[in-house]
Amino acid sequence: MLKATGTVAPAMHVVFPCFSSRPLILPLRSTKTFKPLSCFKQQGGKGMNGVHEIELKVRDYELDQFGVVNNAVYANYCQHGQHEFMETIGINCDEVSRSGEALAVSELTIKFLAPLRSGCKFVVKTRISGTSMTRIYFEQFIFKLPNQEPILEAKGMAVWLDKRYRPVCIPSYIRSNFGHFQRQHVVEY
């Protein structure tokens, strides 16, 4: 568990390379705790390195009164993409939940680019953009198939919670899984 020192580290700018807007400023306990992952390069399409992809299809009950996917449903798509990504690197979110602990999304920013309609097929792309001792930073994209039209960009942060739902350090075996994934997907900028 982190020990309080009574000092506050300055806010650290975290820049997500796919967003042209101002950087997300996240307060961190120490500027040395953030570890950016070098596992990605923004190339788009199926050639994106370090990215997990899952194809889905819009269901009628996900639509709003205007005939497009309700904005709240996109967060569900993102969560599903996160869970599937975690499973591919050996982390089963259901098992974590049954143990009484949780990996909880504490921040999620979504930029809507275009709507999805009933029957549209799309791909959710998820990648981890960085980690610290207590946080996981991720980026997600939704593209409409078959033409890869950008639908959504999202960025977020997840924290590990203990059985009392208090934030704690991410267990070493989880950090190890991320490290292993990073080593497998290192690319040059």
Swiss-Prot record:
Record organism: Arabidopsis thaliana
Places the protein is found: Plastid, Chloroplast
Protein function: Acyl-ACP thioesterase involved in the production of fatty acids and beta-keto fatty acids. Can produce fatty acids of medium to long chain (12:0, 14:1, 14:0, 16:1 and 16:0) when expressed in a heterologous organism (E.coli). Possesses thioesterase activity toward lauroyl-ACP (12:0-ACP) in vitro. May play a role in cuticular wax synthesis.
Keywords attached to this entry: Chloroplast, Hydrolase, Lipid metabolism, Plastid, Transit peptide
SUPFAM superfamilies noted in UniProt: Thioesterase/thiol ester dehydrase-isomerase (SSF54637)
One GO process term, biological-process aspect: lipid metabolic process
Gene giving rise to this polypeptide: ALT1
Keyword flag Membrane: no
Pfam families: 4HBT_2
Protein name per its UniProtKB record: Acyl-acyl carrier protein thioesterase ATL1, chloroplastic
Keyword Transit peptide: yes
Stretch forming the transit peptide: 1-48
